[in-house]
Amino acid sequence: MYNYLLIRYGEIGLKGKNRSYFEKSLVKNMQSALKDLEIGKIKSTQGRMYIPLSGSSDELTRVLDRVTRVFGIETVSPAVKVESDLEVIKKTALQVFKNHMDSISPQNQVSFKVDCRRADKLFSKNSMEMNQILGAHILDHVPGLKVDVKQPQILLQVEIREDGTYIFTEKIPGHGGLPIGTTGKGVLMLSGGIDSPVAGWLAMKRGIQVVGLHFHSYPFTSQRALKKVEDISQVLSRYGTGPTGGFKLITNHFTDIQKAIQNYCSESMWVTVMRRFMFYIANRMAQKEQAMTVVTGENVGQVASQTLESMHAVSQDVVNLPILRPLAGLDKKEIMSKAETIGTYDISIRPYEDCCTLFLPKNPKTRPSLEQTKREISKLNFEELVEESLEKTEIKYFEPYQDITEEELTFDV
Ligand SMILES: Nc1ncnc2c1ncn2[C@@H]1O[C@H](COP(=O)(O)OP(=O)(O)OP(=O)(O)O)[C@@H](O)[C@H]1O
């Protein structure tokens, strides 16, 4: 029955002179998310956007599933748009209301409220009069109701605008943030763990177009470990509908670097030296990608190695771009709950090894100094090892909706 999806955006609306740039980006990102669904032109007017719908519930399920993942959106409402004629509005408001009642199958008396907004001042009734007319009409036709203006179970909203009247009962939350691509590009150091996918998601939420970079130590780490990172990339691709759409994953073959570290460096410094290589390569990749930042899933104090000394030793002088650590202020519980919401948690907890866990020394240095780290690195042919690993780099693109199954759709309408 719904013929439009109303889109509300938050922070973009505060952007002053740059507002239209952010609005256009949001429209483009929504178009990109919906590109294979034969949706009509998205309209943008008076601080709102409208996606035309065909009326089929299957289409609405898909559109909701995709659009609520597009960053920049605060809330969305499936709505019925009709001509601004009193009798037509009454009839449709009742239908929309009954439709909502059917979806909640109430046991007891249901409370409701009508909230009408008249933006079109040429319409003959004002908002208060419309609230009364529509409230009375619904009470007359649906048994077992009561009006509650403070905490109604059902809020029927009616917006009388110049181009027609929109009627709806639901406000479904999006993730907020800014449209991807509006703040630049970043390279995300993506492991198979719980944290880095969440860090990448948070960077995407702030409008950064993220490219994943994974270090893989085949045959020490298995193909199944790599598959885990690919599956995470697939999930992230569903939020990544920026200017180019989808998600790009760069895989760096790290085996020879790890072997060299094991052979020549002090055992307690293995992890620090390995991380310093990773940051150096991430910086190189960021330059190649014309990215402006390196994003990591590091936390402060979550594990023994995540000390400020260690962060300094692994990245100082090898990264010349800002490093974003979006998880720095979050507790593990908060990160896990975010990973569940995003849909990466179940993949991240699959029990496959990762190159860091495999090469874990018995007594890793938790507060390494920069000098000590540089001394260890000087035992290796740093540049040559990096160049060799870069030659074996692979790139894979993940399209957001190519393999999505019915079960994976989050909306059921
Ligand atoms: N194999 C890898 N490939 C790419 N980045 C990695 C890899 N291993 C670690 N990193 C980066 O280093 C960060 C810190 O890793 P560490 O193992 O200390 O923490 P973690 O809390 O286990 O992180 P995660 O849960 O993301 O694996 C990761 O969040 C990620 O950004």
Swiss-Prot record:
Chain positions recorded as ATP binding sites: 189-190, 214-215, 275, 297, 306
Pathway in which the depicted protein is active: Cofactor biosynthesis; thiamine diphosphate biosynthesis
GO MF term (any one): ATP binding
Gene3D superfamilies per the UniProt record, alphabetical: 3.30.2130.30, HUPs (3.40.50.620)
InterPro entries per record: Rossmann-like_a/b/a_fold (IPR014729), ThiI_AANH (IPR020536), ThiI_fer (IPR054173), ThiI_N (IPR049961), THUMP_dom (IPR004114), THUMP_ThiI (IPR049962), tRNA_STrfase (IPR003720), tRNA_sulfurtransferase_ThiI (IPR050102)
Uppermost EC category: transferase
A GO CC term assigned to this protein in UniProt: cytosol
Subcellular location per the Swiss-Prot or TrEMBL entry: Cytoplasm
Chief location bin: cytoplasm
Protein name, entry field: Probable tRNA sulfurtransferase
Species in which this protein is naturally found: Natranaerobius thermophilus (strain ATCC BAA-1301 / DSM 18059 / JW/NM-WN-LF)
Lineage start: Bacteria, Bacillati, Bacillota, Clostridia, Natranaerobiales
Gene label: thiI
